[in-house]
Amino acid sequence: VYLSMGGDKIKDARRLAEEVIDCGKFALVNYEKSLNTDEANKDLLFSDEHIFSLRGQNVKSDAEGVHKQITGTDGNVQMASGYQSILYLGDLEDYRLNWYKSFYIIKYTSDNSERFFPKMPMIRLSEMYLIAAEGWMEDDPEHAAELLQTLKQARTKSIVNKQTVTEEMILLEMRKEFVGEGQLFYVYKRLNHDIIGNTSEDGVKASNSVFVLPLPEEEIEYGYRN
């Protein structure tokens, strides 16, 4: 909320995010340990990072109805090769690529998903790192880079050390991190950023017609909104 408010409230956002990071109750997944875990024990939901999640027995079946065709072999939510190149920049070591199988998302539908109890993450530790990094981006770019680096080390071994952080770098991690969680639209809206498509040419330009809901006709007529 503070991050969306902007201005001096950004300082509150980064302070509270780092309080969660430093509290010791949550931990980022270990990349090497996750990579070397057999398929039956892979936790694609990153459960240890969940600060708050919604649980329900129908998460898997509901996700199957959205993320893949029950009667076919292909998914109806596809990651085109062009989008993968834009998103991962050729980094095939990123553990989050395990969320995709045969072009559909298996984040919530993998065979072992019920082992970790069906759930939908609402707030995760990784989000705290991204909030803190964005909050420090202008005032202390080196610290922001350290935060982003720590998160990336939990996701891939292909790390390039950076001394600074840009909005585009943070947005790129958000796009990789929030797959299937319904967050990205609101990130694009908050930043008034173009929505990225499968290629750099087929996205949606940021505008009020995309991000601002029109007033109902009754509100205009009876609410003195002209």
Give the residues covered by each predicted segment.
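Acidic/polar-rich alpha-helix caps and helix-coil junctions
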Residues: 1-68, 74-79, 84-226
